Amino acid sequence: MSKNRAEKAEIIEEIGEKLNEYPIIYLTNFEGLTVAQSNDLRGRFREAGVEYQVTKNTLARLALDRIEGKDALEEFFAGPTAIAFSEDPAKPARVLQDFLEEEELGRPELKVAWIEGDMYDDPEALDTLAELKSREELIGEVIGRLLAPAQNLVGGLQGPGQRLSGLLQSLADEEEDE
């Protein structure tokens, strides 16, 4: 069933908003997936908090034309294309990597990952991107490192005090025994 101009304009607008809103965009070739596999993949993306949609290349290119700075993605809208939109660079890569390992299909293929202005279109990029830490993990590490010196200081101050307390207790015990 063909879509009318108004429906197509709405789709172009929706894709354009997402392309503009999300700093992380993955384009994949989903060719060769069964309906069940495709639905499974969509569910995995949804669980990870990643928006995933199949789109017509023509409509996606028209949406790209309206957005500044992401026109380099246009060449990757060829053949069957699905777009994953995310705030976290590692989540889509982890979903794809897990799916590829479990299904052993070699599909979907990563066409390109757009990570805040940088493009990764190397087949090995998926492994590298999947290993990236999330923003929350990085914040946790920074906080841990900032707190470590204070914890070491407290431990250092408590150590001699505890030794002195133990020594005084031993002396007191000896006096009681005498």
Curated annotation (Swiss-Prot):
An example Gene Ontology molecular-function term: structural constituent of ribosome
Example of a GO biological process term: translation
InterPro entries cross-referenced by the UniProt entry: Ribosomal_uL10, Ribosomal_uL10-like_sf, Ribosomal_uL10_bac, Ribosomal_uL10_bac_type, Ribosomal_uL10_CS_bac
One of the record's GO cellular component terms: large ribosomal subunit
Similarity comment text for this entry: Belongs to the universal ribosomal protein uL10 family.
HAMAP family: Ribosomal_uL10 (MF_00362)
Role noted for this protein: Forms part of the ribosomal stalk, playing a central role in the interaction of the ribosome with GTP-bound translation factors.
Complexes and interactors: Part of the ribosomal stalk of the 50S ribosomal subunit. The N-terminus interacts with L11 and the large rRNA to form the base of the stalk. The C-terminus forms an elongated spine to which L12 dimers bind in a sequential fashion forming a multimeric L10(L12)X complex.
UniProt name for this protein: Large ribosomal subunit protein uL10
